Amino acid sequence: MKITHAMIIASLLASSSAFAAEKIVVINAISDVGVGKIIGTVKFSDSDKGLVIDPDLGELAPGLHGFHIHEKASCDVAEKDGKKTAGLAAGGHFDPLKTSKHEGPDGMGHKGDLPALEFKEDSSATRALLAPHLKVADLIGHAVIIHEGADNYSDTPKPLGGGGARLACGVIE
């Protein structure tokens, strides 16, 4: 009987660990007036290769969009130089090691640099991505932001990859 109880407890512990290694985040459109409608979800899950990112998103323009984990768990508008900016309350790119380098998901710079999201002609993004230097536990208490344009993972010719305005956001709790 003790073996059966031990097996049940081990099974419960294993299943609770599996749940801890996955987060589904609701993504909302954002603008300089605040958080707007839901445009989809992103599922983050741990794998032996890193963080697997499964987007199920719509309603953004076709093409590549910069995609990052940001410092703070907020999608709110904030003001900079007297101008209200969408999602600015999320802060900058998640950079816990203070590298101040923008090197992309495979580099050793900001841990918040994710692979670019590709939105298809029907305005959807569903292709899975991999961030090799992250795990689900790293994301808790931060926001994920989708930018207007592509990201070149460099600070030249524009800072932070030149992704442009923040268009969508989700808080990772």
Can you describe what each PLM-predicted range is?
Residues 4-5, 112:
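Hydrophobic alpha-helical segments and their boundary regions
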Residues 6-15:
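Bacterial N-terminal signal peptides
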Residues 19-173:
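N-terminal leader/targeting pre-sequences
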